[in-house]
Amino acid sequence: GVSLLRSIHHHMKIGLIDVDGHGMKKKRGAMIYPNLALSKIAAYHRCIGDTVEWYDPLFCDGYDKVYMSKVFSFYEYHVRAKEIVKGGTGYDIHSQLPVEIDNMQPDFSIYENVPTDTSYGFLTRGCPNKCFWCVVPRKEGAIRPYWDVDKVANGRKKLVLMDNNILAAGDYAIAQLDKIIVRGYRIDFNQALDARLVTDEFALRLAKIKWIHSRIRFGCDTTVQIKECKRAMDLIHSYGFHGEFFLYTMIGGKNGF
């Protein structure tokens, strides 16, 4: 296991680059949310005794390995190191973390601006929809269970959940929402929910959940979804929700606003 690897491993100096987060900002870390892949990579390498830090071009000859993660394809970043690993949809939509790294609890301490009382992660991966603007179905495939909410929480009470379509997970989603309610987690599904999937069974639970900023997010990407969003919001209100709704929209494109 990891403990055996640590004992025989030649300790390395690891550099991390959050291309989206560092490219346009002076501060260290993500613009808004931490990069989950880099947080897991940091946890893995620290676990086997490596030194992990943000890549500093002034010391570029001192790195044994540099990981570059890019979600979007807008930025380019040039580095020098003995070994460079590039990952994320900005480089290759099919890139994935090795299983032994993906199973690690992320180390958010690499980010100076991430709240220590908040955890970030996914309950599911994938999505059954095939929206023309989205790479998730091509990258991750059909919806499937990923991590239990208690594993994501890892002792924290605030959770930012980045699932692309949690409600499409059916009974698994119901079970996870029930656990969120029982545990008293305060959550945010920051990639939004699919209003078309909101049934009475879901609405009852969504109304009971403690939401960060008392806000539920929905995707209203096209004009045809306006009616479904209104239906879902009215249904959740009918079960006693008194917070606010946040709708994502797309400007331009097929059926866009």
Identify the residue ranges that each predicted region occupies.
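A short, structured N-terminal alpha-helical element that caps or precedes a catalytic domain
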Residues: 1-86, 91-93
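N-terminal [4Fe-4S]-dependent radical SAM core
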Residues: 5, 12-13, 21-23, 76, ...
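Flexible, charged surface loops at secondary-structure boundaries
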Residues: 8-11, 58-64, 78-81, 114-115, ...
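Core AdoMet radical
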Residues: 16-19, 67-71, 135-232, 243-253
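Acidic/glycine-enriched edge-of-secondary-structure segments
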Residues: 29-52, 130-134, 185-193, 216-223
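Hydrophobic positions in alpha-helices of CheY-like receiver
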Residues: 45, 180, 236-240
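Surface-exposed amphipathic alpha-helices with a cationic face
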Residues: 80-82, 135, 233-240
